[in-house]
Every structure is written in C-alpha cells, then in structure tokens.
C-alpha cells in the first residue's frame, strides 16, 4: 500500500523521517502546561494553573505569503517559520494576549525531510522567542497541487488575557502619543510588489549588494519578522498601553486606524525614525511615491503603541532597556485617517 501511495507521489516514509527530524526542535518550545506529545490527534494545554480570574482566549492565524518565493530561490528555509509565528503572535499581543500555544500547517509538493525540518526549526525558534509551545501541526504532501520544490506555510496561535486587562483601544483620546518600535526590514508583507520590482522591473540579482544596502539583496529580503511579544508583555505590566497596531499589509495607512476609536486619526511625524535603506531601494526601482510606500510597507516601524502623553519618556526608556529601538512618531488627532507632518513625502 505504501509503495502504491509513493507511486502516486506521496512518500509516507519521508513523512515519518520529517517528524523524527523535527522532534528536537519542537521539544525546546514545551511549557509545563502542555499535556500531549508530538504525534497525537490533538494538542492539549492545561489552563488551570495560570491563575486567571476571568480568562479570555485570543486567537490569530496567518501565513507568510509570497515571501516564500524568495526562500525557494535562495534555498533557505530556516527563518520562514519565524515569519509565520511572528505574523500570528504579534497580532494577538496587540490585544494584550500572552501567547500560549501554536500550531502549524505545511503543504508541499514533495516531502523532503531535511527541508521540512528546517521550516519547523524556524517555527520552533519563533515559538521560543514568543514564549509559546508548538503543540501540533500538519505536513501535507500534495503532488499536483504544488511544484516539488515549493510549499506553503500557515500557523495558528492562541493566547490568553485577563478580561479586565484587554487592550481594546477604547480609552485612546486625541493628544495621546504614538510610539513606534523598529522593524527588521520588510517583514512579511508586500512581497508580491517586491518581487515585481526586483525581478520584473529592475531585474536585480539576489546575490548582489546594491546601494544603499550593506548585505546581498536576497539576505535583506529574507530577514525574519520581528517578534514583539516579550517586551510588550513586560511593558504592559508597568504602564497602561491604550492601544497597539501591528504594521502589516496596508502599512501605516490601514493598520494604525484599526486600533483607534471612531472619530480619531493619527498624525505621523515624518522623519522621526530612520527608514531602512531597503525601502529607499524599492521606492527608487519601483518608481513609487512615498505615500504609496506608507500604504504598503511598514517603513521601519513594525508596531505602534498609543500611550498617554505623560508616559512617553518612561515607556520609551523601558522599551529601550528591553532591547527595543523605540521612537516617538506622532500623536492621536481629532478626525479619522492618517496624515503626515514634518517632511516632504516625495
């Protein structure tokens, strides 16, 4: 039976080997609340020891998108999993959640055990950084659906928060300050446009260093998404964070309004933080307007926090103590939308 399945394109033995290779990576993510081992039908997590009075579960799911195409071209698969975790846990921490556990889904044209193990290593690295356990997943070999050397990765995170400490944005008011946390480059959004600019318009090579970059283009494009969970959870224990926005697809223009109450908007001080050079390269080669860049990419800010104006300096100081690069980037204003002040948006 296994041989007949193999002739149809599904190698069961390769799947077993992949599971064996990934076990060491999964094990390092374990938390004491995990009651199940790798290979069960479902993952089990005991909430009873966490001590919440009114626990609220917060979940998020996401994938890596067409950034995967760069990984295929570079034959580099050990950081894509970090991206997958980051996209999920950053989305739930903005509501005040501590990530508890994570599950992944990998679909591929051909199960190459060593490649699957590399992907899972990245997922496990991301889980360790976020403090959550990798309690389950699925690797689906799907010949005819994907090319042999291609795959897709998605994930699902579940976190918990005390009901009274949920971060909803409802307390935000005009005059509150906006603090931005530095990104690690492009992160995981906008890669369909990135690939169009790089390969179709500018015809750039991934192994070359282009001004103003300091590393080969492929290395720059594969930099993993920053995971902000631990510093944000730490800061929330000391200060009231009124709202948070994970800057993903849609950039500043779409994501900052998602945390704001109706009738309020944001004024951003253009030039108040350093914009990574990769965005200058993409703007130049893609012949894009600066405003367009801010509606697509994170432009060097991966997370935005809304705090009382009196809390600016202590919050930034604490974030910097935790290793974050934090900037006062603007303020909340009356009137909806995102506007820019202080520089030419050319």
Curated annotation (Swiss-Prot):
Q: Where in the cell is it found?
A: Cytoplasm
Q: What does the similarity note say?
A: Belongs to the AIR synthase family.
The protein's name? Phosphoribosylformylglycinamidine cyclo-ligase
Q: Listed GO molecular functions? A: ATP binding; phosphoribosylamine-glycine ligase activity; phosphoribosylformylglycinamidine cyclo-ligase activity
Which InterPro entries does the protein's record reference?
Answer: PurM-like_C_dom, PurM-like_C_sf, PurM-like_N, PurM-like_N_sf, PurM_cligase
Q: What keyword terms does UniProt attach to this protein?
A: ATP-binding, Cytoplasm, Ligase, Nucleotide-binding, Purine biosynthesis
Q: Which GO terms describe its cellular component?
A: cytosol
Q: Which reaction does it catalyse?
A: 2-formamido-N(1)-(5-O-phospho-beta-D-ribosyl)acetamidine + ATP = 5-amino-1-(5-phospho-beta-D-ribosyl)imidazole + ADP + phosphate + H(+)
E.C. numbers: 6.3.3.1
Task: Look up the domain of life of the source.
Answer: Bacteria
Broadest EC class assigned to this enzyme: ligase
User: What is an example of a Pfam family matching this protein?
Assistant: AIRS_C
Q: In which pathway does it act?
A: Purine metabolism; IMP biosynthesis via de novo pathway; 5-amino-1-(5-phospho-D-ribosyl)imidazole from N(2)-formyl-N(1)-(5-phospho-D-ribosyl)glycinamide: step 2/2
Gene Ontology biological-process entries? 'de novo' IMP biosynthetic process; adenine biosynthetic process
CDD domains to which the protein is assigned, alphabetical: PurM
Species this protein is from: Geobacillus sp. (strain WCH70)
């Amino acid at each position: 039976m296994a041989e007949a399945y193999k002739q149809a394109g599904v190698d069961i033995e390769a799947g077993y080997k992949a599971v064996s290779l990934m076990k060491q990576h999964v094990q390092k993510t374990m938390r004491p609340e995990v009651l199940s081992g790798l290979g069960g039908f479902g993952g089990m997590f005991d909430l009873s020891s966490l001590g919440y009075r009114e626990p609220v579960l917060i979940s998020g799911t996401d994938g890596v998108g067409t950034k995967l195409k760069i990984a295929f071209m570079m034959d580099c698969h050990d950081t894509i999993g970090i991206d997958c975790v980051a996209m999920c846990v950053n989305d739930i921490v903005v509501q005040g959640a501590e990530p508890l556990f994570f599950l992944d889904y990998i679909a591929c044209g051909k199960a190459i055990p060593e490649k699957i193990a590399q992907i899972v290593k990245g997922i496990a690295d991301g889980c360790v950084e976020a403090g959550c356990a990798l309690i389950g997943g699925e690797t689906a070999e799907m010949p005819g659906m994907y090319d042999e050397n291609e795959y897709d990765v998605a994930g699902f995170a579940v976190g918990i928060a005390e009901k009274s400490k949920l971060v909803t944005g409802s307390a935000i008011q005009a005059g509150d300050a906006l603090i931005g946390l530095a990104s690690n480059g492009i992160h995981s959004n906008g890669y369909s446009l990135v690939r169009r600019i790089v390969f179709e318009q500018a015809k750039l090579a991934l192994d070359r260093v282009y001004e103003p970059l300091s590393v080969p283009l492929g290395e720059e494009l594969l930099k993993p998404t920053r995971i902000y969970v631990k510093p944000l959870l730490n800061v929330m224990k000391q200060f009231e964070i009124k709202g948070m926005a994970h800057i993903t697809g849609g950039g500043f223009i779409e994501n900052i309004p998602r945390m704001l109450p109706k009738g309020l908007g944001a004024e951003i001080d253009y030039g108040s933080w350093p914009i990574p050079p990769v965005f200058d390269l993409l703007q130049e080669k893609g012949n894009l307007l600066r405003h367009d860049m801010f509606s697509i990419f994170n432009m060097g800010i991966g997370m935005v926090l809304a705090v009382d104006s009196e809390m600016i300096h202590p919050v930034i100081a604490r974030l910097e103590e935790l290793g974050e690069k934090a900037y006062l980037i603007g303020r909340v204003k009356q009137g909806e939308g995102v506007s820019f002040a202080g520089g030419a948006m050319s």
